Amino acid sequence: MEIVYSDMETSSCDYSFSHTDDEDSRSSLHPASPASSCGKPPASPAGLQQKKRRRGRARNETTVHVVKKNRRLKANDRERNRMHNLNDALDALRSVLPAFPDDTKLTKIETLRFAHNYIWALSETIRIADQKQGKSRDGPLLLPGLSCMADAPSPGSDSCSWPSGASSSSSSPSYCNSDPGSPAAMDDFGYLQTDVVYSYRNFVPSIY
């Protein structure tokens, strides 16, 4: 009886060993997934793609935000530099404008208006000087009273006499009728310039 029991135990052990070999082969053919081992269902390919898209969107939004911030900072720097250059140019313009003390503060528009009027006054002065220079080249280089005396036909003639009721002759020049002592005759070159300077100075008190 002992021999029979021992044979049965040996056969049962062999059967158990063969069963474990079958289980090992099955486990090697079908490996367990990490999700199933943890008790979670496996993720589908569609879910993985959605996660990748979300990550890409988050990265894109972050990049766009950084780019917008950099552009805004660069635009602010450009505007700041432009205003600094404009203020420097206006300060240089104020330094060359006349009739203003050093402590006078002018706004931008007042500085530009005053510079416009100052340039206009200078251009008018140059234009009047050119006109007078052209007239002096055409006519005799003498004062009005002296030219009248030089063009007189005779000392006793009435053609160049000063205005005393007698009519002038046709041979006398047109400027013989002016009084040599009058400001219009002596300051013929400067009376228009005086008007220009007067109109220019009328602008100065309105700025203060």
From Swiss-Prot:
Embryonic nervous system. Expressed transiently in neurogenic placodes prior to delamination and formation of cranial ganglia. Expressed early (6-somite stage) in Rohon-Beard spinal sensory neurons and later in neural crest-derived dorsal root ganglion neurons. At 24 hours post-fertilization (hpf), expressed in specific regions of the brain and spinal cord. In hindbrain, expressed in presumptive neuroblasts adjacent to the rhombomere boundaries. In basal forebrain, expressed in dopaminergic progenitor cells. Residues 1-62, 159-180 are annotated as: Disordered. It is found in: Nucleus. One of its GO terms (molecular function) is protein dimerization activity. It comes from the Eukaryota. GO terms for biological process: anterior lateral line nerve development; axon development; axon regeneration; axonal fasciculation; dorsal spinal cord development; forebrain development; forebrain neuron development; generation of neurons. The keyword Membrane does not apply. Residues 70-122 form the bHLH domain. PANTHER family: BASIC HELIX-LOOP-HELIX PROTEIN NEUROGENIN-RELATED (PTHR19290), NEUROGENIN-2 (PTHR19290:SF171). This is Neurogenin-1. It comes from Danio rerio (Zebrafish). The gene is neurog1.
